[in-house]
Amino acid sequence: MPDLLVPLYRLPPRETGAASVRDKGVILRRANPFEQTPVGAFIRTHFSAGWAEETAVTFARQPITNFIAIEDKKIIGFAAFESTRKAFFGPTGVDPAHRGRGIGRALLVESLWGLHDLGYAYGIIGAAGPVEFYRKSVGAIVIPDSWPGVYADLLR
């Protein structure tokens, strides 16, 4: 899975982020420091303990570099950035029961605007799975010879 490069100076409008899912009853916002436990539990339940650990560092940053999607006071998605490495987006995920509603794209856009607001010109999507989704959504391009990149020699 290659890394992708995203030019943050050509992002879709901010309105395609949180505002795009609000009318669907989804609140998309930054996580709060006191929400680390429920966010971590959501990630462990729906994705992996490794992702929960990788995302934990976002709660030590100011502002927190983790957006969450909430519906009926339940977390249904998350997107971390500045977690794996500087300027990296991810990990990210949406509860399988809530996919196909634009939530993942909204989380992506909000997070990339978050990187932009931190002063980066480019963002990196590490070990991107759905390359075509990222290309269509934010103009991401494959970084040649980027696998395994920062994911080489991981402890398991």
Regions found by a protein language model. Give the residues of each.
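Conserved acetyl-CoA-binding loop-helix of GNAT-fold acetyltransferases
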Residues: 94, 100-113, 136
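A conserved beta-strand-loop-helix scaffold within acyl/acetyltransferase catalytic domains
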Residues: 41-96
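Acyl-donor-binding surface of acyltransferase catalytic domains
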Residues: 1-22, 127, 139, 148-150
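Catalytic cores of nucleotide-enabled group-transfer and carboxylate-activating enzymes in metabolic
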Residues: 36, 69-74, 81-82, 92, ...
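Conserved hydrophobic beta-strand within the GNAT/NAT acetyltransferase core sheet
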Residues: 89, 123-127
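Short gly/pro-enriched beta-turn/loop segments at secondary-structure junctions
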Residues: 21-24, 34, 61-64
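A short beta-loop-alpha structural element at the N-terminal edge
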Residues: 27-38
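Conserved active-site alpha-helix within GNAT-family acetyltransferase domains
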Residues: 1, 105, 117, 128-154
